[in-house]
Swiss-Prot record:
Pfam families: Ribosomal_L34. One of its GO terms (molecular function) is structural constituent of ribosome. GO terms for cellular component: ribonucleoprotein complex; ribosome. This is Large ribosomal subunit protein bL34. It comes from the Bacteria. PROSITE patterns: RIBOSOMAL_L34. Belongs to the bacterial ribosomal protein bL34 family. It comes from Alkaliphilus oremlandii (strain OhILAs) (Clostridium oremlandii (strain OhILAs)).
């Protein structure tokens, strides 16, 4: 059986990347929350 996680850099950044997060208001809220929490990495 094939594993479910087949990593792809392009797809990951397209779906969970910084620019995708910035493009929506809820995405910006996520970034804000992660900044407040003090996350080292904001996005994938």
């Amino acid at each position: 059986m094939k594993r479910t996680y087949q990593p792809k850099k392009r797809q990951r950044s397209k779906e969970h990347g910084f620019r995708k997060r910035m493009s929506t208001s809820t995405g910006r809220n996520i970034l804000k929350a992660r900044r407040l929490k003090g996350r080292k990495r904001l996005t994938a």
